[in-house]
């Protein structure tokens, strides 16, 4: 999942040597450390939301909204662990350990982490609605698409094909009719999950 020039083998800094070009990247290097920390913050927050909703502390929230919020939290949990396994391989799998247990935690094999990511995404698929008015919140199709993407990254072809087929069969998403107009429109059936930016 290349998502920045610092992961590209064609990267060039004109101002001299750096950690990328001289091969001295460590676990404390900017992007590596930031991504690791951010993903574990997402895990902690999503877990807290799920625990709160399971404990019935969501007074005043109806069942439909409870399912939506829980589905979004499971989506975030599955997404975070999928990213962790993709970028780092074996990593700590926290299913609600105490702080004391966390100090003694060891890395879980990548295969087990991905199995848990799939499990969380499957729960999200069950709970999330088919669509929202905007693309800023995950839906069933988005969770299926993310599951398919992670499965592709990890060469899990059968899971990737099944998730992609389910997403396509939902008929919610399709390619934009006119590619040249895609970037002018506020929305498109091709866009699954995005945050709108301001070009000015």
List where the protein language model places each region:
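Short acidic-aromatic linear motifs embedded in glycine-rich loops, typified by GG[WY][YF]DAGD(H)
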Residues: 1-74, 82, 86-87, 91-112, ...
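Alpha-helical junction/boundary sensor with strong preference for TPR arrays
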Residues: 53, 121, 128, 170-171
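All-alpha RGS (Regulator of G-protein Signaling) helical domain and cognate RGS-like helical scaffolds
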Residues: 114, 141-142
């Amino acid at each position: 999942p290349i998502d920045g020039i610092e992961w590209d083998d064609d990267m060039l800094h004109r101002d001299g040597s750096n950690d990328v070009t001289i091969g001295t990247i460590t676990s404390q290097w900017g992007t590596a450390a930031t991504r690791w920390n951010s993903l574990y913050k997402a895990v902690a927050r999503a877990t807290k939301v799920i625990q709160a909703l399971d404990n019935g502390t969501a007074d005043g929230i109806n069942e439909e909204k409870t399912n939506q919020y829980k589905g979004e939290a499971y989506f975030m949990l599955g997404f975070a662990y999928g990213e962790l396994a993709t970028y780092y391989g074996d990593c700590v799998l926290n299913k609600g350990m105490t702080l004391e247990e966390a100090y003694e935690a060891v890395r879980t094999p990548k295969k087990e982490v991905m199995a848990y990511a799939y499990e969380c995404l499957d729960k999200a698929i069950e709970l999330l609605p088919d669509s929202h008015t905007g693309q800023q919140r995950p839906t069933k199709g988005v969770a299926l698409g993310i599951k398919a993407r992670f499965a592709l990254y990890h060469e899990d072809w059968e899971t990737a094909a099944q998730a992609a087929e389910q997403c396509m069969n939902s008929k919610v998403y399709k390619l934009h009719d006119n590619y040249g107009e895609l970037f002018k429109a506020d929305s498109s059936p091709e866009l699954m999950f995005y945050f709108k930016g301001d070009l000015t």
